[in-house]
């Protein structure tokens, strides 16, 4: 491989929340670009997290990063525990070039919550969503950013659900989920202001309708036959594989002019149009454009892929 093939060779990345889904794909794509990638999560081969899935582990993610051409290093970490995050940061070669906050793991809390008023929900579950989706990001940034700013050009990516434009005028069906997914957008905006004097860049990035392992399981399909779900959910045709957002973050990390995006809320579809990459199947889904168009008409999925 040439340096053109591995533009991130020699870079140190941390993907916090990389057990599965978007986080795993981001880590693998950073590895494909040649980076050393620390991957964290709570599910290990010896112990599952509260998510309750044992089919994906943080060790497996690290192995996938290495197989892709990078160096994957698994560090089991609960990002609600500051001391464990501090120990993680202390391991990172004395430098950090890319920090990706993809911390969540609250899907098991939202299944019965959508469509219900906030006061009808279990308060402990609602507050747990905020712990998992907001506090984890705050703890990790607080402890990792001092390492990120040691060298100019650091990149911080807050992964969330929805763009600022979309979420800003739409309620995400559940108050606690809405708060958990809008907070990272504001974190990216605020951190962009704070990182500016150090030459750092902070952005929020969202996938579209993500064909994560859990989403595929909910439809009873796999990545190979996901279109079988279109009979009961035609709009699932606008969905995207995790590879798409992984390529989006890798493209940002490799862009020497990435600071032009700082403080902004970006989507995988937007970045695909900018950088010219595609999803794994060669398509370029634009989920958020499709959803906006659907509010005023009946758009064809094919027009947004």
Q: At which residue positions do the language-model features occur?
A:
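Canonical Rossmann dinucleotide-binding motif of NAD(H)/NADP(H)-dependent dehydrogenases/reductases
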Residues: 5-44
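Active-site loop of short-chain dehydrogenase/reductase
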Residues: 11, 70-71, 95-96, 148-162, ...
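Catalytic loop of short-chain dehydrogenase/reductase
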Residues: 105-109, 117-123, 149, 153-197, ...
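C-terminal helical subdomain
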Residues: 204, 224-305
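Active-site-adjacent segment of SDR/Rossmann-fold oxidoreductases
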Residues: 33, 190-200, 256-259
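A short, exposed helix-loop element centered on a Lys and neighboring polar residues
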Residues: 141-142, 189
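The beta1-alpha1 cofactor-binding region of Rossmann-like NAD(H)/NADP(H)-dependent oxidoreductases
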Residues: 55-56, 76-88, 123
């Amino acid at each position: 491989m040439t340096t053109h093939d591995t533009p991130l060779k020699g870079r140190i990345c941390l993907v916090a929340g990389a057990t599965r889904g978007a986080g795993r794909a981001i880590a693998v794509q950073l590895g494909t670009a040649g980076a050393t990638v620390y991957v964290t999560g709570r599910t290990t081969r010896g112990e599952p997290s509260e998510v309750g899935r044992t089919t994906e582990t943080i060790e497996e993610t690290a192995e996938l990063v290495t197989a892709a051409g990078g160096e994957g290093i698994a560090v089991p970490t609960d990002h609600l525990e500051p001391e464990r995050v501090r120990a993680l940061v202390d391991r990172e070669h004395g430098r950090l070039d890319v920090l990706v906050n993809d911390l969540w793991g609250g899907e098991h809390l939202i299944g019965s919550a959508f469509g219900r008023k906030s006061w009808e929900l279990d308060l402990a579950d609602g507050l747990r969503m905020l712990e998992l989706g907001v506090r984890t990001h705050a703890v990790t940034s607080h402890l990792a950013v001092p390492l990120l700013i040691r060298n100019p050009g650091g990149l911080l990516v807050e992964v969330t659900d929805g763009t600022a434009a979309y979420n800003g005028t739409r309620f995400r069906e559940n108050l606690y989920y809405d708060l958990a997914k809008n907070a990272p957008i504001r974190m990216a905006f605020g951190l962009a202001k704070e990182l500016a004097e150090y030459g750092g860049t902070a952005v929020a990035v969202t996938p579209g309708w993500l064909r994560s392992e859990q989403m595929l399981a909910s439809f009873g399909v796999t990545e190979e036959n996901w279109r079988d779900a279109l009979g009961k959910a035609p709009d699932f045709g606008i969905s995207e594989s995790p590879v798409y957002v992984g390529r989006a973050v890798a493209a940002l990390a490799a862009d020497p002019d990435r600071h032009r995006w700082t403080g902004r809320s970006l989507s995988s579809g937007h970045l695909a149009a900018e950088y010219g990459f595609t999803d794994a199947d060669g398509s370029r889904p634009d989920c958020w454009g499709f959803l906006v168009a659907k509010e005023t008409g009946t758009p064809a999925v094919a027009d947004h892929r």
